[in-house]
């Protein structure tokens, strides 16, 4: 389900403050965030965010194609180790 247009995109308030401070300082440090539900805005382009996936902060550098998506889309929370092999194929 898509968010209503009149509401606008959701962005955590602290995230905006951290991004503005990083832009003002000109430093390219990783900005640690826990808000996976926040929407990526055009003013975040060029910054690097450390998005928390439940274990660690995954570095995500923002480009123009990511605008409008959520931070959580770029930080997977589950690891897939593959299915077990076919036992019939091993015997033959």
Curated annotation (Swiss-Prot):
It comes from the Bacteria. The keyword Transport does not apply. One of its GO terms (molecular function) is structural constituent of ribosome. GO terms for biological process: ribosomal small subunit assembly; translation. Gene3D superfamilies: 30s Ribosomal Protein S19, Chain A. PROSITE patterns: RIBOSOMAL_S19 (PS00323). GO terms for cellular component: cytoplasm; small ribosomal subunit. InterPro entries: Ribosomal_uS19, Ribosomal_uS19_bac-type, Ribosomal_uS19_CS, Ribosomal_uS19_SF. Keywords: Ribonucleoprotein, Ribosomal protein, RNA-binding, rRNA-binding. HAMAP family: Ribosomal_uS19. Protein S19 forms a complex with S13 that binds strongly to the 16S ribosomal RNA. Belongs to the universal ribosomal protein uS19 family. This is Small ribosomal subunit protein uS19. It comes from Rhodopseudomonas palustris (strain BisA53). The lineage of its organism: Bacteria, Pseudomonadati, Pseudomonadota, Alphaproteobacteria, Hyphomicrobiales. The gene is rpsS.
């Amino acid at each position: 389900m898509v968010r209503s247009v009149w509401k606008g995109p959701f962005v955590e308030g602290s995230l905006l403050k951290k991004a503005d401070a990083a832009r003002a300082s000109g430093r390219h440090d990783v900005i640690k965030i826990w808000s996976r539900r926040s929407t990526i805005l055009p003013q975040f382009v060029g910054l690097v965010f450390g998005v928390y996936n439940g274990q660690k902060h995954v570095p995500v550098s923002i480009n123009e194609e990511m605008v409008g998506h959520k931070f959580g889309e770029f930080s997977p929370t589950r690891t897939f180790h593959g299915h077990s092999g076919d036992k019939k194929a091993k015997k033959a």
